[in-house]
Amino acid sequence: MPAIVLIGAQWGDEGKGKATDLLGGRVQWVVRYQGGNNAGHTVVLPTGENFALHLIPSGVLTPGVTNVIGNGVVIDPGVLLNELRGLQDRGVDTAKLLISADAHLLMPYHIAIDKVTERYMGSKKIGTTGRGIGPCYQDKIARIGIRVADVLDPEQLTHKVEAACEFKNQVLVKIYNRKALDPAQVVDALLEQAEGFKHRIADTRLLLNAALEAGETVLLEGSQGTLLDVDHGTYPYVTSSNPTAGGAAVGSGIGPTRIGTVLGILKAYTTRVGSGPFPTELFDEHGEYLSKTGREFGVTTGRRRRCGWFDAVIARYAARVNGITDYFLTKLDVLSSLESVPVCVGYEIDGRRTRDMPMTQRDLCRAKPVYEELPGWWEDISGAREFDDLPAKARDYVLRLEQLAGAPVSCIGVGPGREQTIVRRDVLQDRP
């Protein structure tokens, strides 16, 4: 059976955790394929319990599902162990969590360099989370990174860490005037942490492909969003990995022909965290309303998210670069009680109108949104479970977004709970 990729179609924080949780009871595997603990998924169970996950796939909250941290993820061992402990303390069974032997480990020098670099950059900083994600991916590309499997060979691990620290300490001490790290202490701390997770290390590529051959369903769960992709996002204000659908194959070891459905998660308005262009950003009472009503604060950083109206240019772009087959529209309920809801249908750049994503960041920074005004609705829609339960104006809003976004809206979120979802098309049953 083909795999399903679940991706964020904006700048992240679209509600991917809710979508994974909704589908989790009907799949056998959930795989996190990129990123690190620089992003978070919030899942609200039918019991009302709220879980914030940063490294572990959202499927861990569904009994019987095997969860995988794939080779494309960078793992902070301390964060992993704390997250596992937090889940276990709340009665969650984590026995079926596996970790790819080829995932990279985030080391103390990655965090140190990330933090001092951001401070050094000052007003020109990217706005990272300061968790060492970028420096860890830099080492991966430079072929000097530490992989999960290295903890199984202490001698090899020691050689690698000593070589890395020799260079990293030069940077920390001579450029940033910080203290040098002791490689022996780094190794000892890592080996101690590894005792808590090394029994989970596996050849996950082999297991995932065997599962697909056996007819099992694999859900590939991305973090962040399309516009934060290092290749396809608003560079340089991006993450250091590929949250797009193409990254799912690379970060899991599943071939692209194994993927049959790409489910894009799309918020009914737009948000982003950190620096970078944001054409529909609001600085008035409407932005304040979206922030407060949508509870737009980062799961990982706690930072307030920037808020703006829905941007169809971005949605079409996401559909194009990901090959999105279906959209899951989230937080439609947040728009209730607005008299009208503007939707960005295009940009104006130096007097020229376009419906497409600008080729350069310079043009995107100068883009002015061209709005189409849609009528709002006042009804509380949080109890709607069928599309026809929605007020006519809310249905019209969804249908207009569907026309503009480049793919059908198959699911609609009308609240944070798993059950607060309208399913127009079953993306698991009605599949290629």
From Swiss-Prot:
Database matches in Pfam families: Adenylsucc_synt
A GO CC term assigned to this protein in UniProt: cytoplasm
Pathway entry: Purine metabolism; AMP biosynthesis via de novo pathway; AMP from IMP: step 1/2
Principal subcellular localisation of the protein: cytoplasm
Gene Ontology terms: biological process: 'de novo' AMP biosynthetic process; IMP metabolic process
Enzyme class: ligase
Active site residues per record: D13 (proton acceptor), H41 (proton donor)
Superkingdom of the organism of origin: Bacteria
Details of cofactor binding: Binds 1 Mg(2+) ion per subunit.
UniProt-listed InterPro entries: Adenylosuccin_syn_GTP-bd, Adenylosuccin_syn_Lys_AS, Adenylosuccinate_synth_dom1, Adenylosuccinate_synth_dom2, Adenylosuccinate_synth_dom3, Adenylosuccinate_synthetase, P-loop_NTPase
Binding, IMP: D13, E14, G15, K16, N38, A39, G40, H41, T129, R143, Q224, T239, R303
Cofactor(s) this protein cannot do without: Mg(2+)
Residues reported to bind substrate: V299, T300, T301, G302, R303, R304, R305
MF annotations from Gene Ontology: adenylosuccinate synthase activity; GTP binding; magnesium ion binding
Quaternary data: Homodimer.
Protein name: Adenylosuccinate synthetase
Taxonomic source organism: Mycobacterium tuberculosis (strain ATCC 25618 / H37Rv)
Originating gene: purA
